[in-house]
Amino acid sequence: MTNRPSLSAAPDGNFAVALNASASGWNQAMGIHFVRATADEVIAELEIAAHHRQPYGIVHGGVHSGLIETVASVGAALAALARRQSVVGLENHTSFLNAVREGKLSATARPLMRGRRTQVWEATVTDADGRSVASGRVRFLALEAGDSLAGETVKVKGPSES
């Protein structure tokens, strides 16, 4: 399994700078910028661009769902590190509340439940005026080092291990 990038936290436990410096894949393609990333709260933003819109000119629902999954996943992963675990999403339930065409989106995720084997995180996406445009819950399964995932062995590293 591909190893996740090494992360170094600031003294306050905020991993945002490290996440932004190692942006890749979907996060990079969507232009996601982390403002805060701790085991208790994750905040990320993106500036709406043409590739975020569907044919009616509004932000595609997949962008909202993906943004919710991203902030919840980062928080759940950071919380799991304390147990030397990793996480994988089991379900994402996103509700679209208001259409938005332009400006900045901000997503905030916080844990609802953090157990030994599962976590549930809730997230809200707001527009530049602070109006809620989407909300969702994501449920995660905790993985131990050595577990199998999609035919590969899970490797778990601490926050500053390379």
Positions of predicted regions on the chain:
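Terminal targeting signals and extreme-terminal segments of soluble enzymes
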Residues: 1-162
